[in-house]
Amino acid sequence: MAKAKFERTKPHVNIGTIGHVDHGKTTLTAAITTVLAKQGKAEAKAYDQIDAAPEERERGITISTAHVEYETEARHYAHVDCPGHADYVKNMITGAAQMDGAILVVSAADGPMPQTREHILLSRQVGVPYIVVFLNKCDMVDDEELLELVEMEVRDLLSEYDFPGDEVPVIKGSALKALEGDPKWEEKIIELMNAVDEYIPTPQREVDKPFMMPIEDVFSITGRGTVATGRVERGTLKVGDPVEIIGLSDEPKATTVTGVEMFRKLLDQAEAGDNIGALLRGVSRDEVERGQVLAKPGSITPHTKFKAQVYVLTKEEGGRHTPFFSNYRPQFYFRTTDVTGIITLPEGVEMVMPGDNVEMTVELIAPIAIEEGTKFSIREGGRTVGAGSVSEIIE
């Protein structure tokens, strides 16, 4: 059979399954592919094909993640499923799998459990914007009232973490029965995917967001001016566009892009993903440096103090061997550069052990262009000891 061509006709959405261990995340992932395969919209994947997730490295951290893809009438989906709880924590904090929405799997027989709560909190902290609930194993619960009770508990838990618990779609089903081909339960998988189609909005494409490019290198071209190079992270850039140089100094510097080059050829416009050089009007070589960003004026601002959700590497992952305390001063690596910062742990948390996942407040010694959801690494003497995601800007 010839290899099928990837059709880019449908909008693309990234989703994933989250929830407590053994509540049925991987079985549900298998059931979705199997049910959709009958409509010719997916390749059926068995449980053990998904469970044997390959290891990947993201920011120096090893994470096991399974990726499957499938389609509905409306959209094309990339779906991530992680075998272990630690993989979810690392995945969400590093942004290895950026989710536009998540399917929270809760066993109707057990109700919400500790990792149910932790995954909802992580979703809130790292900016997973929408959650749809699949109450699994409903074939094992005969009591209708018990199902309603579990549903209420899940809705309350979502509301507690600022998700709209009353509005979130809750589908009651059985992933295993659907996987085995029981039509009554297969119908619930279709219902779930309809809810995902309708409730989780299609994300804005990177190209449509305001322009931003982290600066990797700077050089001057005699007679022409200063060029900043880097990979466009989002948006588009045209010759003549006004931009700001942001970070590492108190005030952003305004300038205009007078030329855009890619592979030594002149371009009219660059877009997200392109590696370019931008010629900056009236900027001297010493006014711009690696670690700053070029951005659409007013779209992103420099900050020094923020709250973040952080995963601390274990010593097996190449991290620290010992815990750290408040006032720890490592390097925070944002995009292209390291900046020293001082850590303050939350009240009641005395120290952080390797392998922990913790919220902390960070104060940088120089301002950096950041916003909620910006990812960073924590480094010590050049090696990565943690990974984080900005959850709230303080100043």
Swiss-Prot record:
Its EC number is 3.6.5.3. Residues 81-84 are annotated as: G3. InterPro entries: EF-Tu_GTP-bd (IPR041709), EF-Tu_GTPase (IPR050055), EFTu-like_2 (IPR004161), EFTU_2 (IPR033720), G_TR_CS (IPR031157), P-loop_NTPase (IPR027417), Small_GTP-bd (IPR005225), T_Tr_GTP-bd_dom (IPR000795). GTP binds at residues 19-26, 81-85, 136-139. Residues 136-139 are annotated as: G4. It is found in: Cytoplasm. Residues 174-176 are annotated as: G5. The keyword Protein biosynthesis applies. Residues 10-204 form the tr-type G domain. Keywords: Cytoplasm, Elongation factor, GTP-binding, Hydrolase, Magnesium, Metal-binding, Nucleotide-binding, Protein biosynthesis. Its main location: cytoplasm. Mg(2+) binds at T26. Residues 60-64 are annotated as: G2. It catalyses: GTP + H2O = GDP + phosphate + H(+). Residues 19-26 are annotated as: G1. GO terms for cellular component: cytosol. GO terms for molecular function: GTP binding; GTPase activity; translation elongation factor activity. PROSITE patterns: G_TR_1, G_TR_2. It holds the Pfam family GTP_EFTU_D3. GTP hydrolase that promotes the GTP-dependent binding of aminoacyl-tRNA to the A-site of ribosomes during protein biosynthesis. Monomer. Belongs to the TRAFAC class translation factor GTPase superfamily. Classic translation factor GTPase family. EF-Tu/EF-1A subfamily. HAMAP family: EF_Tu_B. This is Elongation factor Tu. It comes from Geobacillus stearothermophilus.
